[in-house]
């Protein structure tokens, strides 16, 4: 099995569980003006799924040592790419892309593609294996981010004296 594929397959269910019962206020709450809301995290996942991960994967599988631009999430965020979108629409779009990407990845011959390379503009030479591991790592980072936003906003304010023993960092 390709590295990271099991995590990529599991992420939709994990996110579905985290988003179940989420109010609009919770979805759009930001701990600070320069931090992302849960809705923005989901829109980022939707955008990077196709414009980052799948695009790079296609380039490396189809071409010999393609040159790949950096995906600058902070620049996209500053331009409002992740803001003002409906979280359900963003999730549905992401999930459709993820389903297609899983089918694509399952169809690859691991031995034939795992060491294929691309030239990232900042990182230099990367392999399909590197990208797959980063993709799973990226999923897990945003799962952690959503968990921290939820616990900081939904539960921490209502913990009374227990707040003194925790320092949430959303």
State where each predicted segment sits.
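Short acidic/polar alpha-helix capping motifs at helix-coil junctions
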Residues: 4-7, 18-22, 64-67, 79-83, ...
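Surface-exposed helix-capping loop/turn segments at secondary-structure junctions
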Residues: 21-27, 106-114, 151-156
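Alpha-helical bundle segments that constitute or directly flank the non-heme di-iron/ferroxidase center
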Residues: 1-26, 48-59
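Solvent-exposed interaction patches of small proteins and small membrane subunits
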Residues: 3-6, 30, 62, 85, ...
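Solvent-exposed alpha-helix faces
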Residues: 13, 20, 46-47, 99, ...
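Acidic/histidine-rich alpha-helical segments that form the ligand environment
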Residues: 7, 11, 75-115, 130-135, ...
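Short, contiguous alpha-helical
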Residues: 28-73, 117-170
